[in-house]
């Protein structure tokens, strides 16, 4: 490894140990690992280009994979400390489709048009992307014993609300996070924090290619520094624990998005390198 860097942009600090330079750079997002022979042919047997193809695939894939692992670990911490946003209803709005279809407080939404719903954010994301679409809502209703769940289905067309200026199903949730019960739920919802952000990043990329999201909606390093600064200022009045958890939540979003972006099959990114390496596996020789 020629240089191992934390962050991007101009180098703020560095030191050399052995054959490797360790650097901290100006923008605290991501990082890089510059290896000998990564972009040019080297005769040194230690060089990247002289390693077996599966070793090179493992090295290139490690970056995005560890982005996802970091998001998973932060997700577990957040769920342990704050819980998760349950898709269980506390009520329905008068005159809206959910009430007309017989939904009520206590119902827990499980699917929207066959897309799984794990947390309430899944519902808000789906409504953001499909505001006027007729939706097959699958949900569970607790029976009298409080443990047995009855599976139900409703077909709902969102109704426009003059008050909010949006299309609504007419469902209400508490907005409060619910504690996870036991290790299984902590792992489930902790992992889903990262999965949700990965899913959102993939959908956002699709919207970008379809022209639904413009370049003005994208955030570069300078804007991200501004967002972090604003986030810290807004959460400081609620205590240091809230600041840390909010920054962790932001790190999950950044790490997941960076992992997804790096896997795009673009030559300058890890995904592009992986395409050429897998082609090398198929052909039996470098391209």
Sequence positions of predicted segments:
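Short helix-capping/hinge motifs at transmembrane helix termini and TM-loop junctions
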Residues: 74, 78-83, 210-211, 233, ...
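Conserved PDZ fold ligand-binding element
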Residues: 98-120, 194
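Functional transmembrane alpha-helices
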Residues: 47, 51, 157-258, 275-287
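PDZ-domain C-terminal substructure recognizer with occasional recognition of PDZ-binding tails
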Residues: 104, 110-111, 125-172
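Internal alpha-helical transmembrane segments
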Residues: 20-23, 27-94
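Conserved hydrophobic/aromatic pocket- or pore-lining residues that grip, position, or stack substrates
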Residues: 137, 194, 262, 266
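Small-residue-rich helix-interface/hinge motifs
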Residues: 1-43, 261-269, 274-283
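Alpha-helical transmembrane segments of multi-pass membrane proteins
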Residues: 34, 67, 71, 253-263
């Amino acid at each position: 490894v020629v240089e191992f860097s934390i962050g991007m942009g101009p180098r703020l600090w560095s030191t050399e140990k052995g054959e490797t330079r360790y650097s901290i750079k100006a923008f605290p997002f991501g990082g890089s690992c510059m290896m000998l022979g990564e972009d040019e042919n080297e005769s040194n047997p230690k060089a990247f280009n002289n390693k077996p193809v599966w070793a090179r695939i493992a090295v290139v894939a490690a970056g995005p994979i560890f982005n996802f692992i970091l998001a998973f670990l932060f997700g577990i911490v957040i769920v342990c400390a704050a819980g998760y946003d349950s898709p269980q209803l506390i009520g329905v709005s008068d005159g809206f489709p959910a009430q007309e279809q017989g939904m009520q407080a206590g119902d827990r939404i499980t699917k929207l048009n066959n897309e799984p719903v794990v947390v309430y954010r899944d519902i808000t994301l789906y409504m953001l992307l499909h505001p006027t679409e007729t939706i097959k809502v699958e949900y569970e209703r607790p029976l009298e014993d409080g443990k047995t769940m009855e599976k139900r289905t409703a077909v709902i067309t969102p109704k426009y609300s003059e008050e909010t200026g949006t299309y609504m199903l007419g469902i209400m949730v508490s907005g409060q996070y619910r504690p996870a019960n036991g290790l299984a739920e902590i792992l489930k919802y902790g992992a889903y924090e990262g999965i949700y952000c990965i899913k959102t990043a993939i959908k956002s990329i699709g919207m970008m290619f379809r022209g639904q999201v413009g370049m003005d909606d994208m955030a570069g390093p300078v804007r991200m520094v501004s967002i972090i600064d604003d986030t810290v200022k807004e959460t400081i009045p609620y205590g240091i624990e809230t600041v840390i958890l909010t920054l962790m939540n932001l790190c999950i979003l950044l790490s997941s998005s960076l992992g997804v972006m790096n896997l795009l099959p673009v030559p300058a990114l890890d995904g592009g390198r992986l395409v050429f390496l897998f082609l090398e596996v198929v052909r039996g020789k470098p391209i």
